[in-house]
Amino acid sequence: MPADVPLTVEQRILEAATRLTPGGIPCAPSETALLHELRRATSARRAGVAVDMALAAGVVDLARLREAARGRRRLPAVASYAIERACAECRSPKESEMLQVWEGDLRFPRPLMNREVIDLSGRVIAVVDLVEDASGTYGEYKGAAHRSRDRQRRDEARAAALRDVGLEGFVIVAGDSERVWRQRMQSARSRASWLPAGERPWRLGRFVPAPPLAHPDEAVSDAMMLDHYRSLE
């Protein structure tokens, strides 16, 4: 191709493609594929989610992604935003959106995501979706998995344990508008204790990644066993 002819996005992907094993198919590097996908994002929020989820899945490396982005001309603003503020500790799209509202819309400092909360005896109380250690504020997104009676009971016990050690929380559920998100975040942060580090009856532990997905055969076996146990009740 003549040097003075601009490359299309598709041509750049093919140019960057690598070949797998002999006889394999051309395969673009994950970072190149993600950059191409970001050009299709309809909003900065969606672009941010795409990057965070690719990082959570382990299919891209953030340093390589940023290096690849520096070599691209006319990168869309939403793509630049998503790569600049990327977070590898969000375990779901809603967590990524929650983080973006917290630090992007409200301009609060970046919190930690999916961290253990530990009491002074060393017991792990919970792993919370979002937590700001300076203020003692945490946030949770509760989707459909939290609607069962047993799950709601566990959630209430967990929230009580977090209150007992002085953490102030907010909860976001499916259907809430981002205006409601902002109100709850601001309200919880204003109620928080803001205790100095040495006076907190809690501390933060390690980051907890998402558990691996079960093998399909194991999932089928688990479902069969649950049906069997239900039949015995």
Residue ranges, per PLM feature:
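Hydrophobic alpha-helical segments and helix pairs
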Residues: 2-63
